[in-house]
Amino acid sequence: MYLSPSKITLALCGLLLTAAQALASQAGWRQITIPGTTADAVPITAVLYYPTQAVARTIAMGPFTVNVSIQTAPEAKVKGLIVLSHGTGGSELGHSSLAEALAQNGYLVAALRHPGDNWQDRSLRQTSLARYATARPQQASRVIDALLQDPEWKGRIASDTKGPRVGAVGHSAGGYTVLALAGARPEPSRFDAHCNAERADDPIFCSTGNARLSVTNDAAAAPLIPPLTDTRVRAVVALAPMGALFTAASLAQIRIPVAVYEAQQDRFLVPRFHAEWVAVNVPGVEMHRVPNAWHFAFMDTPSMSIPSEDGDIAANPPGFDRRVFLGQLQRELPAFFDKAFN
């Protein structure tokens, strides 16, 4: 078939316009507060990242930098809702580049600040293991409740015959959180069993703040863990997850798409006890091993040194380029959810 030069030019212009439109979305940003409930009176602060046509700008927020358009109008429809759960003592801003990438690709992202387990308030870590293990997934489910009922958002979130498209991403204790939403069940007695046997090889998990959550502080821990599965969640990504608490049987019962990322030099949550334990038990898991990466490779690099039980959160092993790796993750996460929902 012959195409005249003018038709070729028009076709190319159309392709360029389509490409420009595909990349036109920026990340909008706004902070919300989710009121307390009868069961849990503590409100939840969350940041929403969403696709918008407004121009984004680079803004420093504490030790992190975001590239967003604040309080601007969202697009009429979003591909789905993604809940983002930070690690213990973390922040709703610590994974902003991943949230921005998902928003630029059409998703509404709700990054919550876990009450009692964030950089300002670690009171949840002073409670029993049963309370800690229960509270985090329930907090994430409250965020889903709020946004699926919100008049501004409920009509924007894409749905199909299975219902609204909802996914979740979590890092570290956030990885635990999203796996619990997917159906993995924690068993408090596994903490003492694991640390009695493996403390020397998993020292940070067993010897820092989590040690206060020992089952010995909770005489009736196992019966206190209610079902945590949120059947609205249809795909999850667990980044360097805390996985040793989960039973193999419950991991084997997960029936939604799961991606697990392992930092191969992780000393905070040693992979063979956590990420790999999850990966060998979840059917059809998509496993990614990140060479030469430490535990905090999945977080944006802060502008200042932030100490942790495993050293400076801003530091990287020699030869590891966090910026390049996060760029890869910013492509892979939207692709994972696109595939899971379609």
Model-predicted segments: where are they?
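Catalytic active-site module of serine/aspartate enzymes centered on a nucleophile-bearing elbow/loop
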Residues: 304-342
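Short glycine-enriched nucleophile-adjacent loop
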Residues: 145-148, 175-187
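Domain-level recognition of soluble alpha/beta enzyme cores
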Residues: 25-84, 94, 104
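Alpha/beta-hydrolase active-site loop
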Residues: 129-160, 192-206
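Short substrate-entry loop that stabilizes the transition state in hydrolases
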Residues: 71-79, 84-122, 267-269
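Cap/lid segment of the alpha/beta-hydrolase catalytic domain
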Residues: 89, 93, 113-138, 146-147, ...
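Short alpha-helix in the alpha/beta-hydrolase fold that links the catalytic acid
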Residues: 256, 270-280
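Short beta-strand/loop motif that positions the catalytic acidic residue
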Residues: 254, 260-262
